[in-house]
Amino acid sequence: MPEWQVEEGIGERRALLLDGETPLAAGVHWPGEIQAGDEFEGKLLRKTGARGTAQHPSGREVLVDKLPRDASEGANYLFAITRGAMTERGRFKLPAARPVSTIAGTISDPMANARSVRRFPLGVWEDIWHAASSGEVDFAGGSLLFAVTPAMTLIDIDGDLPPRELSLAAVPQIARWLTLFDLGGSIGIDFPTLQTKSDRKAVDSALEEALSGFSHERTAMNGFGLVQIVARLHGPSLLHRFATSRIGMAARMALRRAAMVEGPGATLLTVHPALRPRLGPEWIAELERRTARPVRIAIDPGLAIEAATAQIVPHDD
């Protein structure tokens, strides 16, 4: 039976939905983030019709909608976060919330009851992380190319197979990586142009079956091969985090690698110069506490930002 597992990392909480050692979904939370599903009592600061702005207990502002007609500025209400804050190119989107009374049921956080583990099965998180970092996923006969834009996440399909076969081969991979990248919001899929209506219908049917467990709305494929998916957006996907916080993602992975090496001695963590300022004293102190080893940091301009290395070296005399 699939099970959510979490690694309590330094500077992040990583989650995987695993069926044995097969990943089905993934996600990341960073400390201090306001997350979908959080409930809070906050003051309504501004109101325009059914929309407005409320103050979160952290002091941050939250966009709210579905306000009742008699809601008053300055009064306190119980809200539930429906979407975390989003950083996009050139702008920052505040978290979004609604009055708890307007939400049917609850907005569940799958990580809330996850089992904490020291580490995930070998290589599973690394494969997902590197795929999100590159924005490319290979499959037999082709590849998926992901691009994050302010309007939507775009998926381009490339390969050497005939258009119909390439499109059908891409469908199960699209379904798989939507959840592994924790994608939501507006998603555009650019299939190869299919000349016949029957070919387009075959791909639509394959998508319907592959996405049957993924809550969404979807358009039929148009004559240019474009399909649009709209799914609930809870917060930044792995792709969004790399698009807006690549150095932050790489710094956290560097710490994970350093935490995973074993043996007596000191930990030598070698990073690209851009990562060094992100490895603050609190994170390094926590790494030393967890590993019971001193940490040395070396700088190597020849390393890629994502390619930090960690190894055990002898203690200084």
Residue spans of the language-model regions?
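Charged, low-complexity intrinsically disordered tails
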Residues: 11-27, 39-41, 48-52, 62, ...
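Domain-start "cap" segments at the beginnings of catalytic or binding domains
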Residues: 108-113, 118-120, 128-137, 141, ...
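Active-site loop/lid in soluble adenylation, ligation, and acyl-transfer enzymes
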Residues: 59
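Active-site phosphate-binding and catalytic loops of NTP-dependent enzymes
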Residues: 86-92, 130-140, 214-217
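Conserved glycine-centered short motifs in functionally critical loops
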Residues: 140-316
